[in-house]
């Protein structure tokens, strides 16, 4: 199949913000007359929208570029670009490491992508500057499916956590205008979107200078603007989680009873080394507040094993916190050095890799047991499930999520993606609930 010069294909790596950014890139290019290709094979432009948070993400992108290299060998005029965090993090050295690349674009420079693509036929080019005001206000994301949508509300991060590259790849915080967020939410709801997730590296830092609105006020307004749509948000920093936010979550019925609240470690000593800005008692107090106002709330978190200087006692405190809080799910990693971060500059990476892996495995084993126990309590209950798709196992089954973000699989019957269904839970694994349809709510 011949490659169409003005057709592009985006392969997205990493977080939900990157998925939203790929929608922004698509909208900007389509406005200039480019078309989205159905596959890599027919595209004249291939872009990798990249993530730099963890080393394995970099390795995955390196592997994928080897795959793209084969395409370019057969079609030398193919244009290959890297967008997102890795170009901002690794910069022009990427041209030397990966000769297949024609252009680089950082997260704040997507408006100039048409110009970069035009220049790519003659020379390599890069646009990697930060823009303290860029929020892509006025750009309506192109969407690949109609049921769920991501709406960025704040870009960048002012928290300088010792392990994290995000401030160096996405710059300082700047909030999307309050009315622009509401306009986008209203349009999505009018289009039939059933679930909207508000996005930011730290949504709790949201502040609109024009209106003075903070995140709790924005969240309340969003939930009222789309009262029939489920509202989620991520990610929250514990130190910035306010009492008013918890009240808003409790009082607005369409805000999902789920919160992702990364803690990273159960040790106050490690939290200080990580520059997290709070101690473990403050975290415990906020968990207590959440459960007081929102009984049954589903909680998830992030944990890092083997950060610089972590002792066995620190690790044991993390396990203790897990047993106490009983998170519904945990994103678990062992520490890898990210160049340029505070930890890389000032702290030795002194926990042996085999110890990191062992501690991570202990965290995984404990969480798998907790998750299985929590889901094991569900059989016999009736839950509301927003159907997302067919089950991977069978077209006769559907997969959806509760407002607590638990995955539920049940027999299809008369239901379709987008339906809100009451499901009687009949069984579970450590990650999935199984059930039978009770009734179609709407």
Swiss-Prot record:
GO terms for cellular component: cytosol. InterPro entries: Elp3/MiaA/NifB-like_rSAM, Methylthiotransferase, Methylthiotransferase_CS, Methylthiotransferase_N, Methylthiotransferase_N_sf, MiaB_methiolase, rSAM, rSAM_horseshoe. It catalyses: N(6)-dimethylallyladenosine(37) in tRNA + (sulfur carrier)-SH + AH2 + 2 S-adenosyl-L-methionine = 2-methylsulfanyl-N(6)-dimethylallyladenosine(37) in tRNA + (sulfur carrier)-H + 5'-deoxyadenosine + L-methionine + A + S-adenosyl-L-homocysteine + 2 H(+). Residues 143-373 form the Radical SAM core domain. Keywords: 4Fe-4S, Cytoplasm, Iron, Iron-sulfur, Metal-binding, S-adenosyl-L-methionine, Transferase, tRNA processing. Residues 6-122 form the MTTase N-terminal domain. It is found in: Cytoplasm. It holds the Pfam family TRAM. The keyword Ribosomal protein does not apply. Gene3D superfamilies: Methylthiotransferase, N-terminal domain, tm_1862 like domain. [4Fe-4S] cluster 1 binds at residues 15, 51, 85. Binds 2 [4Fe-4S] clusters. One cluster is coordinated with 3 cysteines and an exchangeable S-adenosyl-L-methionine. The keyword DNA repair does not apply. Catalyzes the methylthiolation of N6-(dimethylallyl)adenosine (i(6)A), leading to the formation of 2-methylthio-N6-(dimethylallyl)adenosine (ms(2)i(6)A) at position 37 in tRNAs that read codons beginning with uridine. Belongs to the methylthiotransferase family. MiaB subfamily. Monomer. This is tRNA-2-methylthio-N(6)-dimethylallyladenosine synthase. It comes from Chlorobium phaeobacteroides (strain DSM 266 / SMG 266 / 2430).
